[in-house]
A protein has these predicted regions:
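Alpha-helical linker/edge segments of TPR/alpha-solenoid repeat scaffolds
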Residues: 110-119, 149-159
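Amphipathic alpha-helical segments of tetratricopeptide repeats
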Residues: 6, 25, 45-53, 86-94, ...
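Residue register of alpha-helical TPR repeats
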Residues: 18-19, 63, 104, 143-144
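Residue signature of alpha-solenoid helical repeat architecture, marking inter-repeat boundaries
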Residues: 11-19, 38-39, 59, 100, ...
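Helix-turn-helix repeat elements of alpha-solenoid scaffolds
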Residues: 35-47, 77-86, 125
């Protein structure tokens, strides 16, 4: 079998990065999942991270890490979630992240702190995330952020 040309390979990586990313996020947002869906969520998150690592710019690689932080938090792996979320927040504060990236990373960091049992940081991080979310330029971004904030706040409340 001959190897496809590099441009075709890059397009395939991009296709799978986007598809796996979107499916993993879709599964994280479900109120409940079967064991099979949980496995699918994990697999897609890691696959997305792999494909972005091969072809993505640093910002997309870091967004994939934030997805991994969400999955780790939902799995109850606080140490991993915290490590991934902290690196994401640091990156988006210093690099080319958008206002959305900074707001969402702060929300993920609050969730990771809660799952890690470091509850003293959670309230201030949620407040910071709320303020950042309210300042998003696009109404659709503000609404989507508010939905995620509500979802994650609900998950935190169950801990």
């Amino acid at each position: 079998m001959s190897r496809p040309d590099p441009e075709a390979v890059e397009k395939m990586h991009r296709f799978f990065a986007v598809e796996c990313n979107n499916r993993a996020w879709e599964l994280t947002e479900q109120a409940s999942r079967s064991e099979e869906e949980t496995h699918e969520m994990r697999t897609n998150a890691h696959a997305a991270a792999y494909h972005w690592a091969v072809i993505g710019p640093p910002v997309n690689r870091m967004r994939a890490r934030m997805l991994l932080a969400e999955v780790a938090a939902q799995d109850g792996n606080g140490a991993l979630a915290l490590s991934l979320a902290q690196s994401g927040c640091e990156f988006f504060e210093k690099e080319d992240g958008t206002d959305w990236d900074r707001a969402f990373a702060t929300l993920e960091l609050a969730y990771a702190h809660a799952v890690s049992g470091q509850h003293e940081e959670v309230s201030s991080l949620l407040e910071k995330a709320t303020a950042r979310g309210e300042q998003l330029a696009e109404k659709s971004e503000r609404e989507f952020f508010a939905e995620n904030h509500q979802r994650i706040s609900g998950l935190i409340a169950k801990l």
